[in-house]
């Protein structure tokens, strides 16, 4: 009897994401086992249970997916799982907490592609402002932008101290330089907007972080990209279906939540399929997701 493809879904939360379960099933996993309230200290034991119970041949048909809501903890869990294995007992690993790794990758790839319509340098040397940037998608998108050569600001509506704390913590974990910013007051937010080449709306669903009045201040803005699909739009004037569409009243191109979401979906699907089909075990995190997002966009062009 041929061994089934098994995916173990691990989360520190109280439930796994139905989105991730559906994506795993559609990628061809035949058995999907959820594990909740998983702490970092439990990762080694769970990983070794998964690898030793199937032998080297069964390991090739076994995967571990790390979810949750904490992008830093997910990275630590992924690393702990990787270090808990040794040849020939190795399985494939993939972290995507709350879809943030693949969403951030899609957001950055779409932004980069839009920028390159105007400047071949893309994100390199650009000042990127992430409004709502202390959340899951904002932190990861900030790291990816910084790795591409951008000067990154994670803005918080709770003030500069909050933004700087998130920037320092995230930058330290992933080896990049990020800066904090405040969007707490109109004056603070508009000062940041006036200096930004790229503005990303990465706040919670249904929260507008750039108004029409704010937009008028952002005269340097080349791309406005929003991941909020719930009205009102996170960045005023950016429609959910916009895909590098001129943003009224500005010289910028607009990228909406569904344009990003379509790429995100394809990225997660492809990575799960590649994980299942891999001849040798793979470990996927957000830099890998950005590579796949660029592939998706290259196929569209």
List the predicted regions and their residue ranges.
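Glycine-rich phosphate/diphosphate-binding loop of Rossmann-like nucleotide-binding domains
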Residues: 113-198
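A glycine-rich, Thr/Ser-enriched phosphate-binding loop motif common to dinucleotide/cofactor-binding enzymes
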Residues: 94-113
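Rossmann-like adenosine-cofactor binding region
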Residues: 176-254
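Adenosine-phosphate binding glycine-rich loop
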Residues: 2-3, 230-301
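Conserved active-site and cofactor/substrate-binding residues in soluble primary-metabolism enzymes
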Residues: 38-41, 72-76, 102, 106, ...
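Glycine/charged-rich beta-loop-alpha catalytic/anionic-binding loops adjacent to active sites
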Residues: 86-94, 124, 248-251
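Short glycine/serine/threonine-rich phosphate/pyrophosphate-binding segments
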Residues: 104, 135-141, 163-164, 207-210, ...
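N-terminal ligand-binding/catalytic initiation module
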Residues: 1-88, 288-301
């Amino acid at each position: 009897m041929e061994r089934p493809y098994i995916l173990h879904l691990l989360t520190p939360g109280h439930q796994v994401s139905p989105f991730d379960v559906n994506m795993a099933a559609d990628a061809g996993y035949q058995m999907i086992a959820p594990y909740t309230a998983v702490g970092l200290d439990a990762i080694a034991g769970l990983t070794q249970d998964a690898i030793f119970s199937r032998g080297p041949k069964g390991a090739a048909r076994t995967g571990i997916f790390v979810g949750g809501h904490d992008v830093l903890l997910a990275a630590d869990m992924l690393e702990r799982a990787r270090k808990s294995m040794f040849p020939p007992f190795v399985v494939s690993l993939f972290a995507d907490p709350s879809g943030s790794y693949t969403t951030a990758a899609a957001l950055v790839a779409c932004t980069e592609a839009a920028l390159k319509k105007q400047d071949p340098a893309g994100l390199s040397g650009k000042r990127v402002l992430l409004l709502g940037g202390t959340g899951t998608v904002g932190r990861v998108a900030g790291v990816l932008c910084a790795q591409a050569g951008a000067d990154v600001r994670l803005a918080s509506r709770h003030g500069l101290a909050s933004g700087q704390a998130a920037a320092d913590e995230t930058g330290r974990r992933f080896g990049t330089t990020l800066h904090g910013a405040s969007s707490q007051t109109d004056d603070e937010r508009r000062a940041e907007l006036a200096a930004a080449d790229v503005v990303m709306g990465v706040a919670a669903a249904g929260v507008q972080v750039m108004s029409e009045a704010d937009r008028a201040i952002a005269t340097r803005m080349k791309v406005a990209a929003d991941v909020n699909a719930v009205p009102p739009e996170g960045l005023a004037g950016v429609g959910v279906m916009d895909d590098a569409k001129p943003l009224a009243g500005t010289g910028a191109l607009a990228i909406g939540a569904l344009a990003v979401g379509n790429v995100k979906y394809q990225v997660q699907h492809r990575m799960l399929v590649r994980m299942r089909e891999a001849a040798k075990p793979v470990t996927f995190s957000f830099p890998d997701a950005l590579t796949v997002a660029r592939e998706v966009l290259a196929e569209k062009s």
